[in-house]
């Protein structure tokens, strides 16, 4: 089984916050680019840019926890710009990671079968 931890967070962009949010996401992408064990870090918008889906994958729980610690410096601005609407975590994250994510009320799904290359 894989040790990888994935998550997909869907957020609604708060009124008047799109420009601020896009500036913030660029800061976050730049910061995350150098983090240990981050293999996917992608931000997607719908056509009118009112909804964003953030797709993330980490090598293991250690890498996910390192990202959560780094996110702390962005959290206040992030939560002021958006409202989380759905959060799905895939894999088997550690208790520490689960505790770090608990404020977003995630749904957890475990890997049953398959592979990635």
Model-assigned labels for residue ranges:
Residues 72-76:
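A short, acidic, amphipathic alpha-helical segment used as a generic capping/interface helix at domain edges
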